Each structure stands twice: as structure tokens, then as C-alpha cells.
Amino acid sequence: QIPIAVSPFVAKDPSDRLLAETLLDVVMADLRRTGAFSLLPVGPQNPPLSDATTVNTTLFAQWRAQAADALVMGSISRSPDNQMEVRFRLLDTLRSEDLGGLALSSPVTMLDVRRSGHRIADYIYERLTGEPGFFSTRLAYVRREGANHVLTIADSDGENAQPALRSSQPIISLAWSPNGQHLAYVSFETGKPVVYVHELATGKRTVAANQRGSNSAPAWSPDGKTLAVVLTKDGVSQIYTVNPDGSNLRRLTRSSAINTEPSFSGDGEFVYFTSDQGGSPQVYRVRSDGSGSPERITFTGGFNARPVVSPDGRQLAFVARRDGNFVVCIMNLETRQEVVVSNGPKDDSPSFAPNSRWVIFSSRVGNRDLLSAASIDGRVRSRISLDAAGIRNPAWGKLP
């Protein structure tokens, strides 16, 4: 863990003190949940610091003496046109280096304060770990609201949850487009499963697959030009590819086995999927152009399903049955080594963060369905705070 001190943000107008406190809370909560940082207390003996504080050898030495490898300091103020101005700086106290910062301008709202906090945390995370942050991303999931199923979009910490679609019938299998502007999903609103592509900014929906029988499990290709879907129009479940507007339907798998739950590889060359062709549900892959024969990927245990490939193409998340529990596993696709990253007993629907270092998944806790997250090495596991229970089918959005 990296020892880091985050000094309270200075509110240049006392009336903005609550905004400054919220900004600090968001930044610290984001950093804390990664497990990569040790957040050091900033006691009253330390004078207030802001982006305007003079940076010199004395300041670096002061914070090194308090065991801080990094220091964050910033301020919040109002511009003449009543915009909120947030500024911060990040210091590497070990190397006595100024690592820069951001100057953010936005309307004066609590929502925008939270967004600024996420952007600050993204900057800190990337500069200190070398990996892109993921705090400014969005989550999609389905929650129960009485008799309704509500497709919901929220910030990465579960805050600012907004409904995108309400239906009396189930909504499942959410998948973000690579550009983050669309969601593909399956809706039962017509009395059968149909694949839709939903433009989030406008609410416009396009039918991507409504063939005879079942239409399910959409997955985007990395270039966003193609969806892999599962259809039963010719009998047992098979995988097809189709354009997001429903054109250019093409069959990908051909067997008497059930083939389902596709996920494209990071380079788009392969489609990973679940099949029972060997007698039990296992993960296979096939070339996305349909050439060659399927290759089996998982061999541990009698149930491995719901594969999803990380954005960088290096990891595979899937649901496995281990000792009677359903847990989320991560496989390194180069070494084929596996690690269990969840506790069970009923974990499902893994989805990678856009930096490929985290997964989100649904968990059954007692009689409640909640969202959980874990690092890909399984060392850090957490619940995502949400106001509602009955939450399923999470999907982690792309970087903005």
C-alpha cells in the first residue's frame, strides 16, 4: 500500500465548506476501496494546505516525517460567473516532486462535486500506480422496484442512480458498447426474450435480434460494429453475430450442444462462450470468423460458465462451482492460472472495470441480491453501497 495524506480541501468561501467536505469524502472513499493506498490521518497540528501552498523542501520533509509517500492538497472556490472551481496538486514526498494536478470547472451542485472528486481520484490513482483510474465510470444494473424491473445507471461508487427503463417484465444480460453510449440487453416485454440496443442519451431503442424462439446474451465486439448473440431459431442455443441494427446475421457455432454466453476477446479474434459439449458446462473459445474448431479453456470442476474477457484481453472472469458454492474466478489467459476472487455462495454476472484490474458481480447475501467488487488477484473485496436490494446483472461502463 502507498501511504498517502489527503489534506482537507480549502473552501475559499465559508459557505462552500460542505462542498469541500464532500469532495474530500469522495476522493478518500475512492482511494480506500482500491486497497492500493494507506490513507494517513491529517491532524489539526498540520496547517491547511491548498493548491496555492508554496511547495518547498520544508513541506516535503514535513510530510516525509509523517510517513506520507504522497500528499494531496487543493481548494474549492467560485468563479465570477458562479461556476465551481476545484483545483488540486499531487506531491511525491519521497522524491520531492510535484506530480501536477487538475483545475476543474463545473456548476455548483453536489453531483458535480462528486464528479470532480472521482476525476481527482482517477488522476491520483494513475500517477501513483501507473494504471488508469476507474472512478469516473458508470455502472449499469437491474433492480427490483415492487413488481417492476428497473434498468439503472449509477456512478462507480453506486451514487447518483438514475432509471433508464422500467418494465413489468425481466431485463437481463446488460452489455456496454465500447464507446459507452449504448447498452445492449435482453427484455421480455413482448412475452419472449428480445435483444435491444438502447442509446442512453436519447432513450432510443433498436431491436438487434428478434428471431423465432429465444434471443439472448448480447456481447459487443471491441470495435462496436458487431454483437454476438444467442439464438434458438434453428433448434438448440447457438451463437450468432449480428450488426447492432439487426442486419447481417451470421451463425458462428454449429453443434448439437448448448452454446451460450459469448464474450469477445480483447482483440476481437475469438469469442469465448459456455458449452455443455463435453458433458458439463465449461468455457470454450472459437475464432470470431467461424473458422476452426472450438477449444476448451476451463478444466477445473464440473461447472464453469458466464465467461467475460477483460478489456486488455489478458484475463478471463467466469462463474465456477467450487465446494458447492458459486464463486467468481479469474484466469490469466497466458498462463491459464486461476484464482477465486469472491466468497460465494451465490455470486454471478462478473463484469470487468475498464482498467481490467477489478471485477464487479452480483452476490446473494441472505435473501438480498447486492453488488460486490474484487481486485483480480482477490486480495481486496468490497460491497458497493446502494440504497436498494434486489440488484442483478451488473455491467461496468467504459472510461469517459
Where are these regions (language model features)?
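Structural motif
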Residues: 83-85, 147-152, 192-196, 236-240, ...
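Short beta-strand->alpha-helix linker/helix-N-cap micro-motif
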Residues: 2-59, 72-76
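Residue position within the beta-strands of beta-propeller blades
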Residues: 73, 139-142, 182-186, 226-230, ...
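Blade-terminus and WD-like Trp-Asp/Gly-His loop motifs, strongest in beta-propeller folds
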Residues: 131-137, 173-182, 217-226, 262-270, ...
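Multi-bladed beta-propeller domains
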Residues: 155-172, 198-216, 242-258, 286-303, ...
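Amphipathic beta-strand/beta-sheet edge segments enriched in Tyr/Trp
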Residues: 53-123
